[in-house]
Amino acid sequence: MVIKAQSPAGFAEEYIIESIWNNRFPPGSILPAERELSELIGVTRTTLREVLQRLARDGWLTIQHGKPTKVNNFWETSGLNILETLARLDHDSVPQLIDNLLSVRTNISTIFIRTAFRQHPDKALAVLDSAREVEDHADAFADLDYNIFRGLAFASGNPIYGLILNGMKGLYTRIGRHYFSSPEARSLALGFYHQLAKVCEGGLHDQVYELVRRYGHDSGEIWHRMQKSLPGDLAMNMR
């Protein structure tokens, strides 16, 4: 196990998470006692206690007063906030993880974009208007794309969609910086934002579904061609 961390707490957190991932502490098992675990990792019990509380909040563990700490099945108990951690733990699975992430984005955005256009068109157009002045480089487009989808999610009037996008932010923007290094990807995105604005202005709500699905398909094709050049550090240094 190779762990890179800058603090005792960071080291302890990575040690426990990687031990859960590698089944040293499998789901359903009980963690070693606090004294034993702190000695095993090489941190103070105070530091360990803080780390365990944080991991419990993220869904990795269940802590109950007077009972041993239990390892959870994190797929069932954690939220989107662990996406970056999963990508870091298993780089070989990053392409599939990203495919799943983009599929979720497409599926839910067909709903919240249509709702935003129908119920709050002025807010939606204000979000889309931000694409007019974007600088032509990957970082700017990665931020723009995330902020447009997030902005439209909140413009729908249902903040839960926005919270879902918040949970995707870290991995989403890292993907975006690689994806939008392609001029073709940047051009496709600008065309998509422009088409969305026209649909919103025209009140053509029923066209949203097909427009978003087509963009998901076309951007997916570009992404799959780029996967061969996926940088090895895409999922690294997430902390």
UniProtKB/Swiss-Prot annotation:
Pfam families: FadR_C (PF07840), GntR (PF00392). PROSITE patterns: HTH_GNTR. GO terms for molecular function: DNA binding; DNA-binding transcription factor activity; fatty-acyl-CoA binding. Residues 34-53 bind DNA. One of its GO terms (cellular component) is cytoplasm. Keywords: Activator, Cytoplasm, DNA-binding, Fatty acid metabolism, Lipid metabolism, Repressor, Transcription, Transcription regulation. The keyword Membrane does not apply. Residues 6-74 form the HTH gntR-type domain. GO terms for biological process: fatty acid metabolic process; regulation of fatty acid metabolic process. This is Fatty acid metabolism regulator protein. It comes from Klebsiella pneumoniae (strain 342).
